[in-house]
Amino acid sequence: MSFEEEEKNKVTCTQDFLRQYFVSESVSIQFGLNNKTVKRINEDEFDKAINCIMAWTRYPEAVVKRTASTYLLSDSCKKSTTLSLPFVLDDALCIPKGVESNNNDTSLLYSDTLYGDDSLIRRNEQVRDELEEELSFTLLRSEINEIKPISSSSTPQILQSDYSAVMQETQASNGSIFQFSSP
């Protein structure tokens, strides 16, 4: 494979990844998020992210996935953010310090949390069908004041019954951190 073909293949793989990991607006409706809480990534932002990712990543596919997500997260969100993602939990180097250490203005939901353990291959067609016509991706942005626990205690809130994505508010020295985990 020539250098040009290899570069083209990397871009295609990264584009496929982004299409699959940034969920559609219909999913945000499932989670009861209104229009004010949905952050759209337009085509220009997408192209910028792709170019930047491909310029500074020469890593295996799994690492490219983490860097792609992390880049878009840090580049597109203007508010301070704390996060916990299934594919970066054990890789602190892939979480930008500005995102990792800031306070709790916003919590971001990712499709990896929503879809659970489904592989990219198994959900490829489903997500591609939803997003193929429109090169626009959704970050689900949940304002903390709109997220209420079931009770005044720290009882986890079940967001999706079929996967049982659990959101639990914990206190840290720099404020509340919303963590997403699979039961």
UniProtKB/Swiss-Prot annotation:
GO terms for biological process: meiotic DNA double-strand break formation. It comes from the Eukaryota. Keywords: Activator, Meiosis, Transcription, Transcription regulation. The keyword Transcription regulation applies. Potential transcriptional regulator that is required to activate expression of a number of early meiotic genes including HOP1. This is Meiotic recombination protein REC104. InterPro entries: Rec104.
